[in-house]
Swiss-Prot record:
It comes from the Bacteria. This is UPF0335 protein WD_0557. One of its GO terms (molecular function) is DNA binding. HAMAP family: UPF0335. It holds the Pfam family GapR_DNA-bd. It comes from Wolbachia pipientis wMel. InterPro entries: GapR-like (IPR018753), GapR-like_DNA-bd (IPR046367). Belongs to the UPF0335 family. NCBIfam families: PRK13694.1 (NF010247).
Length: 88
């Protein structure tokens, strides 16, 4: 029984250490991403728009199209459509 507990404890420790290592790698990647955004901002790029584009690129084409149609519909309902501004 003691051997089983020892093996189980070692296995658990292995999982914990792997997760801790991955968490550190995740923090490192997040730091790199922040650095890229900072460099882009320094060069005049709009970070909010870049993040929005990245979010859209992650979406399925059909989902993205549906969201864009809904957004356009809502904007037109509120008088915020670019097309309406051009016609004025």
């Amino acid at each position: 029984m003691e051997d089983t507990v020892k093996i189980t404890a070692e296995e658990l420790k292995g999982y914990i250490e792997r997760i801790e290592k991955l968490e550190q790698e995740k923090r490192d990647v997040q730091d790199h991403i922040r650095d890229v955004y900072a460099k882009a901002a320094d060069e005049g790029w709009d970070i909010k728009v870049m993040k929005q584009i990245i979010r859209l690129r992650k979406m399925d084409d059909d989902d993205r199209e549906e969201q864009e149609i809904l957004l356009d519909t809502y904007k037109r309902a509120l008088g915020m459509s670019y097309e309406e501004e051009l016609s004025e």
